[in-house]
Amino acid sequence: MQPISDPTSAGAEPAGATSLRARTFVCMGTVVSLTVPAQPGSPSDADADRLEAATAVVEDQFEDLDARFSLFKPNSEASRVSRGELSLMEASPLMRDLYADAVRWRRRTDGAFTPERPDGLMDLSGLVKGYAIAEAGRSLVALGLHDWCLNAGGDVLVSGSPAPSAAGGKPWLAGIVDPADRRTLLGAYPLGAQAVGAQAPGALPPGALPPGSREPAGSGARRLALATSGSAERGDHIWTAGLRGPSWRGPSSQGPAGARRPEFAQVSVAASDIVTADVLATAVVAGGRGTLDAVMARWDVDVLAVAHDGALLATPGFRAPSAA
């Protein structure tokens, strides 16, 4: 997924849009970008300094969480827990809290999202990136930034507009990559704009909505986040739901003999908060059509699911002309 209201995307900047600036860094095995519009009347050096400072804060938060939760780092807290050197009860409050959130999401998605790998080891990578984005969003708001787009490996959280001075406020457009050809976009989904000042990005904590509840109705105005899971993005935290024994393990793996491939090559979910979007996208890839139907019954979100033959299943928000 790409924010196409972003100067780093080819042909991205919409006509009449304010000049955009972006900074990137690499963390959690992916590229993280922060894009902001230039401030009217502000010297370019001041804009650059403001963006550099904000990016440094975001990068520090991502690095801290990666150092704690990455299973690729042998000395991380998560690795110590997985090796049995540290019990979950002895782990940090944040480790326990995120595990508890992941367990709640497992219950709410009927097991399609899970914090345990098929080999039984705890793996919170399906939750940590969304949590990092949400925390970074809160920090950007605290820094006084009102208009921005934060993209971490295809998971996007926005605030405000790429053209805040435009009448009515233009939305950010999150481009969704075709899993069969990553050079091609299936379409773009509008995020933010109407939601300016309505809600702090990431304000809903992970798993905050009680089971059986739905987000308040009102597509568009509530959509601040969009996440994509599947073959076009990193999928090493996705395991096919409902299997006993070997299962498909991420898009880069053919999986063991007899493993069932997910029904969908890619799933994108737009929601009011990034954790909900990220978890539900992962859950639908893992759980297939049954989980998709359950998600649509329980949450007010927009979903675009891409089958392996290229067929699309889309909710009205993705079928609308503005999302094309």
Which residues are covered by each model-predicted region?
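Mature catalytic core of soluble alpha/beta enzymes
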Residues: 1-324
